[in-house]
Amino acid sequence: MSSHTRTQRLSVPQLVAMKGRQKIVSLTAYTSHMARLMDPFVDFILIGDSTAMVGYGRTSTLDMSLAEIIAHTRAVVAGSRLACVIADMPFGSYQESPQQAYRNCAEVMARTGCAALKLEGGRALAPTVEFLVQRGIPVMAHIGLMPQFVNQMGGFKAQGLDSEAARKIEEDARAHLEAGAFSLLLEGVAEPLARRISDFSPMPTIGIGASPACDGQVLVTEDLLGLGGPQVPRFVKQYADAGALISQACERFAAEVREQAFPQLQHCYGVVQEA
């Protein structure tokens, strides 16, 4: 279903039904303004815990609170009208137990109006996914390169490059599908592995640094716009240099203020215009 033909917000079942029919498009957002701009063109908007890095300048996604996710998700829901809205659950908000996960996931959904939640974890997380799904919370399972496991993985490294690592990720995928996840997000995994998972999965796979064979693709919007900083992941394609445009606009503003070219009377209130 093309976003250009929709008149209502895309639902999770409609997103699932796109598998095998149309590629799914997603970008990240954490403000209402950005959500409004991308809304006509994407199928779902992801409020990623990557906001900790691209929005707040932190060194990892681990330093993202539940309150921050709720605030940013509320903004994205308010700024969008057509796209399905999916929020990341932050580190430490769901790993302790299925009960903890349900309390926090239910709070995010109730307070924001988002349609689903994304959780990172391998097959050990599958019982939690099943617990949530059985209680009405749609879950997108994030496997492969999992930024919340950055300390355990030793950095942001591609996953599934050897047969044993690939086998474990494939087992993660099957466990989450059996648990009832409506989608799999595959990040930074070997292309043949992502292709294989996409082939056997009855649910949509969303790739980021994975494979063209995935049912959909997502990117961090700041990377797409050239705002992600000097170190850009290999899987990113930059579609615009918004950073240069912003710098140019700031430079022009500063120059005009210092040269007393701005503001002019036309920018002021209560000015009597000469006849």
UniProtKB/Swiss-Prot annotation:
<dbReference type="GO" id="GO:0000287">
    <property type="term" value="F:magnesium ion binding"/>
</dbReference>
<dbReference type="InterPro" id="IPR015813">
    <property type="entry name" value="Pyrv/PenolPyrv_kinase-like_dom"/>
</dbReference>
<keyword id="KW-0808">Transferase</keyword>
<feature type="binding site">
    <location>
        <position position="88"/>
    </location>
    <ligand>
        <name>3-methyl-2-oxobutanoate</name>
    </ligand>
</feature>
<feature type="binding site">
    <location>
        <begin position="49"/>
        <end position="50"/>
    </location>
    <ligand>
        <name>3-methyl-2-oxobutanoate</name>
    </ligand>
</feature>
<dbReference type="GO" id="GO:0005737">
    <property type="term" value="C:cytoplasm"/>
</dbReference>
<feature type="active site" description="Proton acceptor">
    <location>
        <position position="187"/>
    </location>
</feature>
<keyword id="KW-0963">Cytoplasm</keyword>
<keyword id="KW-0566">Pantothenate biosynthesis</keyword>
<comment type="subunit">
    <text>Homodecamer; pentamer of dimers.</text>
</comment>
<dbReference type="InterPro" id="IPR003700">
    <property type="entry name" value="Pantoate_hydroxy_MeTrfase"/>
</dbReference>
<comment type="pathway">
    <text>Cofactor biosynthesis; (R)-pantothenate biosynthesis; (R)-pantoate from 3-methyl-2-oxobutanoate: step 1/2.</text>
</comment>
<keyword id="KW-0479">Metal-binding</keyword>
<feature type="binding site">
    <location>
        <position position="118"/>
    </location>
    <ligand>
        <name>3-methyl-2-oxobutanoate</name>
    </ligand>
</feature>
<dbReference type="Pfam" id="PF02548">
    <property type="entry name" value="Pantoate_transf"/>
</dbReference>
<feature type="binding site">
    <location>
        <position position="88"/>
    </location>
    <ligand>
        <name>Mg(2+)</name>
    </ligand>
</feature>
<dbReference type="GO" id="GO:0003864">
    <property type="term" value="F:3-methyl-2-oxobutanoate hydroxymethyltransferase activity"/>
</dbReference>
<feature type="binding site">
    <location>
        <position position="49"/>
    </location>
    <ligand>
        <name>Mg(2+)</name>
    </ligand>
</feature>
<protein>
    <recommendedName>
        <fullName>3-methyl-2-oxobutanoate hydroxymethyltransferase 1</fullName>
        <ecNumber>2.1.2.11</ecNumber>
    </recommendedName>
</protein>
<dbReference type="GO" id="GO:0015940">
    <property type="term" value="P:pantothenate biosynthetic process"/>
</dbReference>
<keyword id="KW-0460">Magnesium</keyword>
<dbReference type="InterPro" id="IPR040442">
    <property type="entry name" value="Pyrv_kinase-like_dom_sf"/>
</dbReference>
<feature type="binding site">
    <location>
        <position position="120"/>
    </location>
    <ligand>
        <name>Mg(2+)</name>
    </ligand>
</feature>
<comment type="function">
    <text>Catalyzes the reversible reaction in which hydroxymethyl group from 5,10-methylenetetrahydrofolate is transferred onto alpha-ketoisovalerate to form ketopantoate.</text>
</comment>
<comment type="similarity">
    <text>Belongs to the PanB family.</text>
</comment>
